[in-house]
Structure formats: structure tokens, C-alpha cells
């Protein structure tokens, strides 16, 4: 059942992990799924990010595997938040993951 049980437990685990991503670093949905022990759950991580209403969870630090941002924040909002933290972007508007990918440490 959505909204409880295993889904909420998974979402809580996602939020706890995302809270550990420091300013200036990013992680992909798939990377977080792998860290949570379920490498095929990248879409579920995305659902958790979209559903997040928990203060203090820096959802803007989670991007797609190719470094692209999501329009869920509104046009340009995620990019502005990341740039304010010093996250570099490529000429085509993607996060330069090589320099800012969070390693989970």
C-alpha cells in the first residue's frame, strides 16, 4: 500500500542518506539506490525525492545520471541552488559530476 509500510521505510532511508550529501556535492538517483542496497531502485529514489516534504533534506543535490537537473523544482531553481553551493555545470547545462560526485563518505 502506497503511503505506508515498506514504501515509507524506503523513503525514510532515502531521506537519511540524502541528508548526508554535503553542500557542493551531488549524487544520482541510481547511485543512491546502489548505496541503499537496491541498484534497480533508482526510479523509487526519484519518487521519494518528488514526495519529500521533510525540512532539511537537500533534494536539490540529487540529479540524473547524466548530470541533468529535474524540472520539479521549477525552471532553473535546482541549478540556481546548486550553483550557489559551488557545483559546476557544463556548457549544455548539466552538472559536472566528475568534480562534485558524492562518494558516500
PLM regions and their residue ranges:
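Nucleic acid-binding interface residues in structured DNA/RNA-binding domains
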Residues: 2-105
Amino acid at each position: 500500500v502506497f503511503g505506508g509500510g515498506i514504501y515509507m521505510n524506503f523513503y525514510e532511508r532515502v531521506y537519511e542518506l540524502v541528508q548526508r550529501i554535503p553542500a557542493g556535492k551531488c549524487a544520482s538517483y541510481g547511485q543512491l539506490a546502489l548505496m541503499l542496497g537496491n541498484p534497480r531502485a533508482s526510479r523509487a529514489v526519484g519518487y521519494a525525492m518528488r514526495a519529500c516534504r521533510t525540512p532539511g533534506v537537500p533534494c536539490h543535490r540529487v540529479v540524473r545520471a547524466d548530470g541533468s537537473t529535474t524540472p520539479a523544482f521549477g525552471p532553473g531553481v535546482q541549478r540556481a541552488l546548486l550553483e550557489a553551493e559551488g557545483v559546476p555545470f557544463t556548457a549544455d547545462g548539466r552538472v559536472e559530476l566528475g568534480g562534485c560526485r558524492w562518494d558516500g563518505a
